[in-house]
Structures are given as C-alpha cells and as structure tokens.
C-alpha cells in the first residue's frame, strides 16, 4: 500500500476529488450498448433457456439453407474464425469477430441489437463454444451455422470475397508513397502512446462515424496492435461497400520491427 501511495498516479495526496475522478476516467470509452440491456435482464430475468438457445444455434445449415435463412430474417452472418482464414475467403457481407480474441467485448460493442438474428461461420468443433459465448452477453438468437464452412459454400457455387492482407515488410516497401492513407484503429491510449507518423486515428469502436474519411478509390492501409481489430474493421467496411483497404498483418507489433518512422514512445500510465 505504501508503494502504491508513492507510485500510483491516481493516489497523489494533493489531489482533489474532482482531479481524482478526472485521472481515473480519462480515456475511458462509453460502455458497450448491450451493458444496460444485460443489467435489466439480470435484475428482471428474461434470458432464454440455454438448452433452447443451443438447440437453435447448433442447427447445421447447407449453403442453400444458410443463404435462405439470412435473406428471410435479415440475419447477420458472423464469421468467428481466424483473421487469416477470413482474409482468404468469406461469405459476402459477413462480419469478422474471431473467437480467439476479445470476442464478447467486441460483439457487444459492435452489434448493437441483442435481438439481432445471427448465422455463424465457425471452425468445425467450435460451434457450441461460439453459441454459448454469444449467449453469455445476451445474444441468444443464433439461428445455426454453415455446415462444411466456406469450403462447402464454394463447392455449392456461392461467391466469396477476400481481404487484401500484406506483411509488415511489404507495408514498409509501400509506405513511402502512401503515408497519407494509413488508418490506425487501436484505442486512444494505444495511439497516444506511440503511432506511425502521419497515421489517421480511427478507433474501431467509432468506425461507423468516420466512413467518409476513407478514400473512395485509392488503396488505404489498416492496422491495429496485432491484426485482430484491423480485420474486424476490414469486414465492417466491406459490408458497407468499401473494398479498397489493405490489412497489415501483425499490426503495430510487426510494424515496430520495420524502419517506418514512429512517434516517440510515451508510457500509457503517464498520459
């Protein structure tokens, strides 16, 4: 406790209550839209029975059934595989939020309506995990998953889309002529701590508020910290008709190993 009093920026003895509140809340994002809804459900009840949720969500759908279900109820196609798999090929207009990342927080942040019908593209063997993790944050209207995944989708003659994804080394080679078309989708604190010189800061959580800022024709580059959030951003932009993005694999972590100019590092705790 004594060490905390000496070192913790928010425990200075000369701080007023107003200053303390400012320190500990600076940079905090608003709570995800599902938070107040889940609070209400926790207080009043109303969660769907988990067995019913699983029975519905674990329906395996052929490509034709999957497409028909999506059209019938305007279901959101949610791809929960890896960023690399999504980049290689995905169902058009699907949104990527991978299970191997901050899945539940980003689902709650980006899918506003907990009553949104959802169809899953998921790796074999992880179907129940996906349905369960969605239900835990209030999204209990999963209607099923694509049987056989994208391979079955392609074999059925359905079209797929891809994301142009390049290595940090390739990005370094292209950087000098594209410095004004780089978009950093990390959080404010990450960006303020260190970023690429000249990069636009467009947090993933606020992406929909910045659609007009992305070039209409020329390629532009997206990066986050490690490649997870930038692929989410790519999927969201593609679903809104913007397809000229280039995703940087490995994000800022990989870019930091190149010679691309960056701002001086500032410890986040001092911001």
Question: Predicted segments — roles?
Answer:
Residues 2-46, 51-55, 72-74, 83-271:
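Rhodanese-like catalytic fold shared by cysteine-dependent sulfurtransferases
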Residues 43, 59-68:
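Long, low-complexity segments enriched in small/aliphatic residues
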Residues 79:
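Phosphate-rich cofactor/ligand-interacting catalytic cores and adjacent structured alpha/beta frameworks
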């Amino acid at each position: 406790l004594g060490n905390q009093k000496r070192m913790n920026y928010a425990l200075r003895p000369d701080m007023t209550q107003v200053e303390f509140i400012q320190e500990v809340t600076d940079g905090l994002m608003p709570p995800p839209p599902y938070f107040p809804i889940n609070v209400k459900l926790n207080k009043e009840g109303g969660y769907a029975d988990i067995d019913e949720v699983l029975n519905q969500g674990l329906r395996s759908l052929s490509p034709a059934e999957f497409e028909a279900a999506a059209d019938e109820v305007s279901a959101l196609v949610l791809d929960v595989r890896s960023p690399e798999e999504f980049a290689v090929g995905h169902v058009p207009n699907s949104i990527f939020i991978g299970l191997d990342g901050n899945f539940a927080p980003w689902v709650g942040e980006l899918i506003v309506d907990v009553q949104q019908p959802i169809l899953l593209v998921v790796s074999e063997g992880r179907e129940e995990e996906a349905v369960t993790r969605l239900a835990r944050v209030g999204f209990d209207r999963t209607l099923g998953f694509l049987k056989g995944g994208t391979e079955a989708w392609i074999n059925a003659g359905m079209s797929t889309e891809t994301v142009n994804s390049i290595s940090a080394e390739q990005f370094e080679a292209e950087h000098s002529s594209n410095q004004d078309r780089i978009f950093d989708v990390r959080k404010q604190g990450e960006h303020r701590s260190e970023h690429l010189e000249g990069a636009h800061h467009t947090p993933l959580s606020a992406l929909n508020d910045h659609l007009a800022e992305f070039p209409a024709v020329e390629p532009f580059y997206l990066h986050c910290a490690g490649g997870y959030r930038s692929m989410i951003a790519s999927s969201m932009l593609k679903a809104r008709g913007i397809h000229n993005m280039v995703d940087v694999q490995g994000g800022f972590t990989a870019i930091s190993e190149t010679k691309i100019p960056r701002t001086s590092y500032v410890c986040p705790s001092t911001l």
